[in-house]
Amino acid sequence: MMHLSPNRIVRVVVLLAAAAGALLPDASAQTLVGAIDFHAHGDPDGTARKIDVIDLAKAAKAAGMRAIVIKNHYEPTASLAYIVRKEVPGIEVFGGISLDLTVGGVNPAAVEWMTKVKGGYGKVVWLPTFDSEAQVLRDKRQGPFASVVRNGQILPEVLQVIGLAAKHDLVLETGHSSPKESLLLIAEAKRQGVQHILVTHAMTNPGGPMSLEEMQEAARLGAMLELVYSPLTDRQLQQEAEAIRTLGAASFVLSSDLGQPQNPLHTDGLLAMYKGLMANGVGASDIDLMSRRNPARLLGLDR
């Protein structure tokens, strides 16, 4: 009798789902089989969360998902990804580092250390999020913040982090930078040879959402753009569907950004997002591209 490893079983399920999708055009948008959540929050965290990362991985695996990326605004998650993989085999789990104040802000040493964590599952660098200058000023908060640009120039430590992303083939995310900052960062990242750049929740960014024209420029420069649950509204879905039609699905990644106690579970939110976009005219093949193939390419899963 032939025995298959858990990862091979998942790949077989993905292939069977793809075959079903070829026969039933809408099938891939009605299921999470093979999907990847590039932006998943869970406990342990200093912020209240709906579910811990072990149960999150179990739920994602039960739904047939291929991978999740664990995000925490204030703690690196590469080591957490290693532990979750041991506890929940059969789904690929990745982590990263968000360059907020608890890791020293934009700290090249912290990024370098993350790349050394056993397993090599630290794949993503988020430039400052909650502590970004753009969000702190936009929220009119008092207190320190982490800057990425000053007087129109990218700061030296940010240039170093971009260089590390290129060196270690990491996914560089813009975090909660402003649209203007993000475009500067994307151009510099491409100049330094970063292969994988993602604009974090491009249309709902607390540091300032991108306009359609700014998203077009980001895509032209070589970045992909993330769309998230948010939570969903009819207006948001209409605007996202219009952006997908204008730029093309090849430029987008669909993530949940879920884990908040008041919001749905990640799996439920992703399905609602897929169905909502389809109701606004986005095709099943585009959902497949944005939820499966594009994030897999960012993570290097199909090499």
Predicted regions and their residues:
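N-terminal secretory signal peptides that target proteins for export/translocation
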Residues: M1-R8
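Bacterial N-terminal signal peptides
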Residues: V10-L23
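Hydrophobic faces of well-ordered beta-strands that scaffold small-molecule active sites
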Residues: G34-A40, I68-I70, F94-I97, V125-L127, ...
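Histidine/acidic residue-rich metal-binding segments in metalloenzymes
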Residues: A27, V53-L56, A78-I83, P89, ...
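An N-terminally biased module of ancient metal coordination in phosphate/nucleic-acid-related enzymes
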Residues: S28-G90
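Mid-to-C-terminal alpha-helical segments outside catalytic/metal-binding sites
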Residues: G269-R303
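Glycine-rich phosphate-binding "P-loop"
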Residues: F38-A48, F130-Q153
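Short acidic/histidine-rich active-site segments
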Residues: V228, A249-H266
